[in-house]
Amino acid sequence: MEHIRTPKVENVRLVDRVSCKKAALGTLYLTATHVIFVENAPDTRKETWILHSQISTIEKQATTATGCPLLIRCKNFQIVQLVIPQERDCHDVYISLIRLARPVKYEELYCFSFNPKLDKEEREQGWLLVDLSEEYKRMGLPDNYWQLSDVNRDYRVCDSYPTELYVPRSATAHIIVGSSKFRSRRRFPALSYYCKDSHASICRSSQPLSGFSARCLEDEQMLQAIRKANPGSDFIYVVDTRPKLNAMANRAAGKGYENEDNYSNIKFQFIGIENIHVMRNSLQKMLEVCELKSPSMSDFLWGLENSGWLRHIKAIMDAGIFIAKAVSEEGASVLVHCSDGWDRTAQVCSVASLLLDPYYRTLKGFMVLIEKDWISFGHKFNHRYGNLDGDPKEISPVIDQFIECVWQLTEQFPCAFEFNERFLTHIQHHVYSCQFGNFLCNSQKERRELKIQERTYSLWSNLWKNRADYLNPLFRADHSQTQGSLHLPTAPCNFTYKFWNGMYNRFEKGLQPRQSVTDYLMAVKEESQQLEEELESLEERLEKIQKVHLHGTKVKSKQSEPSKHSGFSTSDHSTANTPQDYSGNSKSFPSRSPSQGDEDSALILTQDNLKSSDPDLSVNSDQESGVEDLSCRSPSGGEHAPSEDSGKDRDSDEAVFLTA
C-alpha cells in the first residue's frame, strides 16, 4: 500500500472504445492487488476489476478539455481507457500503477495474499490433482526400454530440469552427465512422450555445443541409446525447430546443431520457427490492428497479414504435425530441440503429444500436458510473461501461441476436444494473473525453494471444480475424432487458420455475439437431456399405470367368482357392492372389500394415492422459444415444456380401474 499515492479518485469516466455510448461516470479505487472502477449509476453499480499483474503498459495521454486520459493495456488483451478530471490525480495514479504492475519480489504477487477460504488439507489436495508419476505410468513406464533416473537428484546435473526424468535403460549415468556437458544449459535429451504400442518416443533437449567441428562421444551414445529403445525403427529424427540460418549463426558462437557425420542413424530436419523477439513484435503488430477503430475489411486483413502472426502459428503447427506423423505413421523416435529447449521445444512437443494422444484432449489430460511439457521441464514463466520487474526483451507470447494452436485444432476437429474455448482463455488469463502458484518462477527448483505448494493454491483444482463451465457440448467419447491420433489434411489449403476473435477481442462486447456458440449448444444439450428425462419419467408412469390396471382386472375377476358360487346376498347394507360408493368421494372408498382377503387389500388404491405417486407432468409452460429460455432451464427444476398428452385428463387411466 505504500506505493499508492491516491487510493480513490471520484468523477472518473470509463470510455467505451468500440461503441458510441456515453462514457460511464464513476469512482476509481487503487488497492494492493487491483484497480477497481465502480460506476455511479444506482441501477447497475457495475464494477470493472483489473489485477496489477495483468497490466502490460500504461500510457498517459495528452490532457483534453474533459480531463487527462489514461490508457491501460492488459496482458489478457483487455484495454481500459479512463479520463481523470485532474492532471495531478492522473499522474499519481500513473506513477502508482507503474510500480504496482512491476513488483520486484515474488511475495508481492497476488497468489501470496489470495485466500479462497480453503483449509490446509484442501490446498494440498489441489496440488495433488495433477500427478506426473501417474502420467508416466499411464504411458506404460517404466518398461524394458526406459527407466526412471535419479541422476538429476537435487538438480545437480541440470538446475532447470525436474528431479525425476525418464531416460533409455542403456544410458548410464556417465553417458547422461557427459551428454549434459555438451548441451546448452546442460539440458540433455530426456523423454517427453512415449507410445507404448510402437515404442516410438519424443525426447527433448537443448542445442549441442558443437560449433563447427566439436563432438562428444557421450552425446552420440545418448542418441544411439534413444534409437535402440525403439526396436521397430533403425533411425531417429533430430528436429531443430529454428530457421537453418539462425542455427548456423549459433555455430559461430560454439553452439549449433548435430553433425550427421558424427551421429549414426539420424535424419536431421529444420522447421523454421522464429525466435522470441520476432514473436513479440509480431503480436504487437497484430494488437495494433485490433485497436483500430472501425477499420475496413481490407485494412484489417492487410494488417493481420503484415503482422505475420498466423504464419508463426502455422510454423509451430507444421512442426507438431511432422513429429506426430513420424511417431504414428513411421514408428520413428524423435529428438526435438531449439536453442535452450524451453520455448519452441515446449511448443512443438506439446502440440505433437496433443495430436497423438486423445487423453491430452480431455480436461484433465490437458492440465497434465501443460504440467509436464511446460512447468516441469523449466519453461521460463517469470521471464517470458513479466511476473516481476525485469528485462522487457525476455518477454514473449510463447505459451499464448501454443494455446492458440490448440484453439485452431478445436476449430478443425470440433468433436475431438472435451474442453471449450472458455477453458483455453481462462488458462491464458491465469498465466498472467499470478492468482495461483502454478505459473510462477522459471523452474521446478525455484518453485520448491519458494515453497509454492505450501504458500499458494493450484489453478488445476479450481478449473476442475468448475469443469462444467468448460465442457465442449460436441465432444463424444465414442466419436471417431476422439480415437487415436488426429490426422490433419496433407494439403495446406484444407487447413484454415483463423483470427481468434474470442481471445484478442473478448473484452470488446460490441464485437462479440450476444451468446457464444458453445453456450447455445450447451443450452440445446441441456434441453435435450431434460426432454429425455421427462420421456423416461412418462415411460415409468405408463408402466406403473399398466400394472395397476392389470391388478384391477384380477381383483374384478376375484370379486365376481364368490358372487356366483357362494350365494352371498346383496342386501341394502352391503357396502362393497353399492354403486354410489364407487362413484362418490374417493376418500369414502373402502380400504377393504368384504369379499376380499387380506392379501388383496393392498391392490385397492385411491385417486389421491395415484396422484401423489407421480409428478404432475401436465403443467404447461408459457416460455417462449429462444436461447435465453433454453439456457435457464434445468432438468432438476423449473418449468417444463408441455408434453403431447398435456391436454388429456391425467386421471383417465386411473378412472378405468376405479369404475371397474
Swiss-Prot record:
One Pfam entry for this protein is Myotub-related
What do we know about how this protein assembles, alone or with others?
A: Heterodimer (via C-terminus) with MTMR9 (via coiled coil domain); the interaction enhances MTMR7 catalytic activity. Does not homodimerize. Interacts with RAB1B (in GDP-bound form).
Describe tissue expression.
Answer: Highly expressed in brain (at protein level). Expressed at low levels in liver, kidney and testis.
Basic and acidic residues composition bias: residue spans:
641-653
Q: What is its EC number?
A: 3.1.3.64
Q: What is this protein called?
A: Phosphatidylinositol-3-phosphate phosphatase MTMR7
What PANTHER family does this protein map onto? MYOTUBULARIN-RELATED, MYOTUBULARIN-RELATED PROTEIN 7
Q: Where in the cell is it found?
A: Cytoplasm; Endomembrane system
* Principal location listed in the UniProt entry: cytoplasm
